[in-house]
Every structure is written in structure tokens, then in C-alpha cells.
């Protein structure tokens, strides 16, 4: 108020309800994320994931030879073929983060300036 302070409020990014599973092919050294993975030559459907292989273009670290990143699109989540039965129903309808939806990428900011 009268002290002339400007107040800036923000929060962490949000999460996304996931409903569709997609298979990911990866070795045992790949990261374990549900909506984001990195590893050596990991693969998923282009319909369900963004596959980043030109790491320098995105300012991403190369964590080893042939490293790439997968980011889940829309309401997809990643499953390994050998764990499909175990996790598919458990994860469906849950809220996850790490993908590239607007809810996960945008951070709200409110600036209150006294008049």
C-alpha cells in the first residue's frame, strides 16, 4: 500500500492428467520419468512424444554417447513393454509432470503495483 512496495507472486509449474500410455524402447540405464526420459538411443512414437536428438540446438547436456530426450505430448505417459500390465491402470487418470503441455511449461506470475 502506502509503503510503495511492488509484490510479485508466482508458483511452480503445474501437472497434467494422463490418460494414454505409449511404449518406450530403452535400456536399463535410461531415466525413469513418466512424461520425460533421457538415455541412449531411446525411442517412442512421434505421435505421442517429442524426440530430441540434436541436443545442442536445445541447450541440453549430452549425458553420454547417443543420448536423446523424449518428452510426452498431450496426455500421454511412457511405459516399458515389460511393465505395461503393472503400471497402465495405476497411472491412467493420475496427475504427472515433466511433459510439454501448457500446464507443465507455463508458470503463472502476478505483479501487484501500488497506485
Ranges and model annotations:
Residues 1-115:
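Feature captures the catalytic ectodomains and active-site-proximal regions of enzymes
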Amino acid at each position: 500500500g502506502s509503503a510503495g512496495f511492488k509484490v510479485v507472486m508466482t508458483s511452480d509449474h503445474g501437472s497434467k492428467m494422463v490418460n494414454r500410455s505409449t511404449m518406450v524402447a530403452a535400456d536399463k540405464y535410461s531415466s525413469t520419468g513418466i512424461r520425460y526420459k533421457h538415455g541412449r538411443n531411446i525411442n517412442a512414437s512421434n505421435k505421442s512424444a517429442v524426440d530430441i536428438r540434436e541436443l545442442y540446438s536445445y541447450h541440453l547436456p549430452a549425458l553420454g554417447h547417443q543420448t536423446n530426450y523424449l518428452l510426452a505430448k498431450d496426455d500421454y505417459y511412457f511405459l516399458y513393454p515389460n511393465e505395461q500390465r503393472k503400471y497402465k491402470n495405476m497411472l491412467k487418470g493420475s496427475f504427472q509432470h515433466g511433459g510439454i503441455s501448457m500446464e507443465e511449461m507455463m508458470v503463472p506470475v502476478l505483479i501487484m503495483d501500488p497506485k
